[in-house]
UniProtKB/Swiss-Prot annotation:
PANTHER family: KN MOTIF AND ANKYRIN REPEAT DOMAIN-CONTAINING, KN MOTIF AND ANKYRIN REPEAT DOMAIN-CONTAINING PROTEIN 2. The lineage of its organism: Eukaryota, Metazoa, Chordata, Craniata, Vertebrata. This is KN motif and ankyrin repeat domain-containing protein 2. One of its GO terms (cellular component) is cytoplasm. It comes from the Eukaryota. Widely expressed with highest levels in liver and skeletal muscle. It comes from Mus musculus (Mouse). Involved in transcription regulation by sequestering in the cytoplasm nuclear receptor coactivators such as NCOA1, NCOA2 and NCOA3. Involved in regulation of caspase-independent apoptosis by sequestering the proapoptotic factor AIFM1 in mitochondria. Pro-apoptotic stimuli can induce its proteasomal degradation allowing the translocation of AIFM1 to the nucleus to induce apoptosis. Involved in the negative control of vitamin D receptor signaling pathway. Involved in actin stress fibers formation through its interaction with ARHGDIA and the regulation of the Rho signaling pathway. The gene is Kank2. Residues 547-561 have a biased composition (Polar residues). Pfam families: Ank, Ank_2, KN_motif. ANK repeats lie at residues 606-643, 673-703, 707-740, 745-774, 778-808, 812-842. Residues 1-31, 161-182, 410-577 are annotated as: Disordered. Residues 183-234, 282-313 form a coiled coil. SUPFAM superfamilies: Ankyrin repeat.
Length: 843
């Protein structure tokens, strides 16, 4: 076989120079070679081919140089292939499976020069001539199945000729493998297929080149779309289109509404719904009812004012007494009317100030208590009242107003049979009326007695309602439980009367302000002092009650004489200006809690939560503020006791989320009058700890004692509780806390209540060590004055009180402790063997 020779000479029309130096001089390749389209060289020399087969170097891939495109290759006479421009192009993908490309000498322009330079080879020339002749003969002879009948040569061209099968096998004896040329029709068909494939490949290459451009255009269009979307949204929010439009903006032609649009027809689709169906409370009706009640009360007050003015005009000026006399107006009135429902309270339990007190001046909200009891029979009672009213002096210069108290003695019959009493049967006496001293000296005053006849029951009830709702500010009512229904009952009632008008629906603060303003408008003098519950006269036993009214006058006279005159004539009492008005929500919540305390299954969880929250908020707002009024707290306590003893215990000891009760807050605010009222209730838990672990007794260390009453109050608190109780955090006692804060008065009170001075906290410290550490010399002296004080106790660090004082630099306290130690050592008791008697006996 001939050896394949690679010719590096460029094709015509391509840059570069062909040089013989491309062929090595030491190992020159044979001049005869055939190159395949993919750069493989086939050696035609048989011997060389056999040698390569043995060595395994039959096919070698060489670097393919770039050749010109189609049409650039010359068609020389030495080329038997008529379409060399298509078969020899390395850009064709279909030419990889084609047959051999036999290029003659005219294909390479320098082939002749190489042949002449290297030298002629007769063997190669004969092979070429033989191959040319065979090709011409085969082209002249018709061939029908050239492609199918040809088989590839087994001599080394299997890889390049297997797919085509152009060359028949050559006899091995000849030493040459000469391929047989295909037919012209087949070559033309192959050439057309390759040309079409090349065109298709070229189109695909052009389309591939357009892909980046199209991607760029697509990204540009997407960006424009995003900008247009943002611009469109901004125009929708602004409500008007922009004046300028960019070149790439999308123009949308939207139909515009006509200038004169047709009138749109509208209709209402609302539905009328009653508020009570929606669950909304009828506030308007409640306000209307409230206004009606206020108007009625105002009319009654105006009528009374007109009546008083008429009486003043009827009085003659010459009938007045001298200016030095006191003004006293006595009125005896017999009233008959239906019995009102009252809250019964026993006088056998509780302290003196807590027994059976009237709830009339506490507001109209207490009428809701009637719902908890059963139906009662309508009873008719008659009341004999001794009333002192206010009469302005008809002087030309000033008009002074005198405030008096109303003392009513009511005699009721439980049988329901009404009894009428004539006005003449009542013996009015001057001693039966309470004496009221004027607050300021009055220039001219006279004593008059006004006797009012018996009025109808309805009129008397209206008058009493006006008195109770408009002018009643404080009442103390004592009621005895009847042993027999036939036994008459007597109630003694003290009512402070003010001339002003108040609304029963107002709260305590509003009522207080309006009462004060009305008092100022009527006269320059403040109201008289109302007797406290302790100053009220004691009731007689029920067995000593007298059915007739003739003896009531002396009895009242004796009891009124027990009241000291200076107290009656003292200045204005702030208790008169306090008005308690229970809200309906608080009353309903208290009743609900009372039911729950009696029966835990009586309320649902939601109802219990609502009632508990309402009572907690109202009670904390009333009693836990720093400016809480003790009288208002006392009245609420009386109201709660009248409802139920369990309710009183529950409300007084109710705690907030931090575990603080009203007693905790009152002690912390140093509001000791409220503390006194809470302690007087008899149900206050004084040792209850909050979440921080402190009891009200421990919190007294933070309070400041201002008066002697405050000291007495904390003494009462200490006696009711455990003064040696420890806090849950550090184990400190009330004495340790008071010593640490330097409260000398509290320390004295605790020592007076026998507080233990030797109790140690979790660190082993005592109250004496706390005093030495903080440098409280006076408190140290108080602690050392206690005989049971042990100065030798040590803490966890092994330090005594003397060592603590020395470490803190308290030299004076250290000297006091040292002196106490020396005194103890000198007065220490001797043992038997050290006593003088034993020593003398031994001698």
């Amino acid at each position: 076989m001939a050896q394949v020779l690679h010719v590096p000479a460029p094709f015509p029309g391509t840059p570069g120079q062909a040089s013989p130096a491309a062929f090595p001089s030491k190992e020159p390749d044979p001049p005869y070679s055939v190159e395949t389209p993919y750069g493989y060289r086939l050696d035609l020399d048989f011997l060389k081919y056999v040698d390569d087969i043995e060595k395994g170097h039959t096919l070698r891939r060489v670097a393919v140089q770039r050749r010109p495109r189609l049409g650039s290759l010359p068609r020389g006479p030495g080329s038997w292939w008529t379409s060399t421009e298509s078969l020899c192009s390395d850009a064709s993908g279909d030419s990889r499976h084609s047959a051999y490309s036999y290029c003659g000498r005219g294909f390479y322009p320098q082939y002749g020069a190489l042949e002449t330079r290297i030298g002629s080879n007769p063997r190669v020339e004969r092979t070429l001539l033989d191959a040319r002749r065979r090709l011409e003969d085969q082209a002249a002879a018709p061939s029908s199945g050239g492609l199918g009948s040809l088989t590839p040569s087994a001599a080394g061209s299997t890889s390049s000729l297997a797919g085509v099968g152009l060359l028949p096998p050559t006899p091995r004896s000849s030493g040459l493998s000469t391929p047989v040329a295909p037919s012209a029709g087949h070559l033309a068909h192959v050439r057309e297929q390759m040309a079409g494939a090349l065109r298709k490949l070229r189109q695909l290459e052009e389309q591939v080149k357009l892909i980046p451009v199209l991607q760029v255009k697509l990204s540009v269009l997407q960006e424009e779309k995003r900008q247009l979307t943002v611009q469109l949204k901004s125009q929708k929010f602004l409500g008007h289109p922009s004046g300028t439009r960019s070149r790439s903006e999308l123009c949308l032609d939207l139909p515009e509404a006509p200038d004169d649009p047709a009138a749109l027809e509208t209709r209402s689709v609302g539905t009328w719904v009653r508020e009570r169906d929606l669950g909304i409370p009828d506030g308007e009706a409640a306000l209307v009812a409230k206004v009606a009640v206020l108007e009625t009360q105002l009319k009654k007050a105006l009528q009374e004012l007109r009546a008083a003015q008429t009486q003043q005009v009827d009085l003659q000026p010459q009938a007045w007494p001298p200016p030095d006399t006191q003004v006293r107006v006595d009125t005896v009135r017999v009233v008959e009317g239906p019995r009102e429902v009252e809250v019964a309270a026993s006088t056998a339990a509780g302290a003196l100030a807590q027994r059976a007190q009237s709830l009339e001046p506490y507001g109209t909200g207490l009428k809701a208590l009637t719902t908890s009891g059963g139906p009662e029979n309508t009873l008719v009672f008659r009341s004999h009242e001794v009333v002192e009213t206010m009469c302005p002096l008809p002087t030309a210069t000033t008009g002074n107003v005198h405030t008096a108290k109303k003392i009513s003695i009511t005699e009721r019959s439980c049988t329901g049979a009404p009894r009428m009493t004539e006005p003449s049967s009542v013996n009015p006496r001057p001693a039966a009326a309470s004496v009221v001293q004027p607050e300021n000296p009055v220039p001219a005053a006279q004593d008059t007695t006004d006797k009012k006849p018996t009025r109808p029951a309805a009129a008397s009830q209206d008058s009493q309602a006006a008195d109770g709702a408009g002018r009643a500010s404080l009442a103390t009512k004592r009621k005895e439980d009847p042993a027999d229904p036939e036994v008459n009952q007597r109630n003694l009632q003290f009512v402070g009367v003010n001339g002003g008008y108040e609304s029963p629906s107002e709260d305590s603060s509003t009522a207080e302000n309006s009462e004060h303003e009305s008092t100022e408008n009527e006269g320059p003098e403040p109201p008289a002092r109302v007797l406290s519950p302790a100053e009220c006269p004691q009731l007689r036993p029920p067995g000593a009650a007298v059915a007739t009214t003739s003896l009531e006058g002396p009895q009242l006279s004796q009891e009124s004489q027990r009241v000291p005159a200076p107290e009656v004539a003292s200045g204005p009492d702030p208790e008169e200006e306090i008005r308690m008005d229970l809200s309906p929500d608080l009353i309903s919540a208290c009743l609900a809690l009372e039911k729950y305390l009696e029966n835990p299954n009586a309320l649902t969880e939601r109802e219990l939560k609502v009632a508990y929250t309402t009572v907690l908020q109202e009670w904390l707002r009333l009693a836990c503020r720093s400016d809480a009024h003790p009288e208002l707290v006392r009245r609420h306590l009386v109201t709660f006791r009248a409802m139920s003893a369990r309710l009183l215990d529950y409300v007084v000891n109710i705690a907030d989320s931090n575990g603080n009760t009203a007693l905790h807050y009152s002690v912390s605010h140093a509001n000791f009058p409220v503390v006194r009222q809470l302690l007087d209730s008899g149900v206050c838990h004084v040792d209850k700890l909050n979440r921080a672990g402190y009891s009200p007794i421990m919190l007294t260390a933070l309070a400041t004692l201002k008066t002697q009453d405050d000291i007495e109050t904390i003494l009462q608190l200490f006696r009711l509780g455990n003064v040696n109780a420890k806090a849950s955090q550090a184990g400190q006692t009330a004495l340790m806390l008071a010593v640490s804060h330097g409260r000398v008065d509290v320390v004295r009170a605790l020592l007076a209540c026998e507080a233990d001075v030797n109790i140690q906290d979790e660190d082993g410290s005592t109250a004496l060590m706390c005093a030495c550490e903080h440098g409280h010399k006076e408190i140290t002296g108080l602690l050392l004055a206690v005989p049971s004080c042990d100065i030798s106790l040590t803490d966890r660090d092994g330090s005594t009180a003397l060592m603590v004082a020395l470490d803190a630099g308290q030299s004076e306290i250290a000297s006091m402790l040292y002196s106490r130690m020396n005194i103890k050592c000198s007065f220490a008791p001797m043992s038997d063997y050290e006593s003088p008697a034993s020593s003398s006996a031994e001698e």
